[in-house]
């Protein structure tokens, strides 16, 4: 089994809304280590994910997504802290700009004391990202 550890967030793509006072948002599951876990699982590799994930709406969606992709979520720590958001906006030339909302968020608050005392015996590789 490959264990990936790190970011679990939503990329939120912001575009002009239907009026001058609105913005259209499209949120997608993201985070490099989370994406690695999903990609490995899709390739048939047994995979687990270790992070701290919120109990908020976004966090529940992250867990549901990982489970739907057959990624083991048993090592995930749950919390009331909010989910990290990465806002992506395009300028007039289509160049993206990024704003990260990470202050006090779940995946940034994993403490050493919350790590498992021992990894499952099946873990052969650990990937830690961003």
Can you describe what each PLM-predicted range is?
Residues 1-71:
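Glycine-rich phosphate/adenosyl-contacting loop at the front of the ribokinase-like
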Residues 46-130:
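Conserved N-terminal subdomain of the carbohydrate kinase-like
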């Amino acid at each position: 089994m490959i264990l990936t550890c790190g970011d679990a967030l939503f990329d939120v793509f912001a575009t002009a809304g239907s009026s001058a006072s609105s913005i259209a948002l499209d949120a997608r599951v993201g985070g490099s280590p989370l994406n690695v876990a999903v990609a490995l699982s899709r390739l048939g590799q047994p995979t687990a994910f270790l992070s701290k994930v919120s109990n908020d709406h976004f966090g529940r969606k992250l867990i549901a997504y990982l489970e739907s992709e057959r990624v083991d979520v048993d090592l995930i720590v749950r919390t009331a802290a909010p989910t990290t958001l990465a806002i992506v906006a395009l300028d007039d030339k289509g160049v993206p700009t990024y704003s990260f909302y990470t202050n006090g968020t779940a995946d940034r608050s994993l403490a050493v004391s919350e790590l498992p005392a021992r990894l499952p015996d099946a873990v052969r590789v650990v990937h830690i990202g961003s």
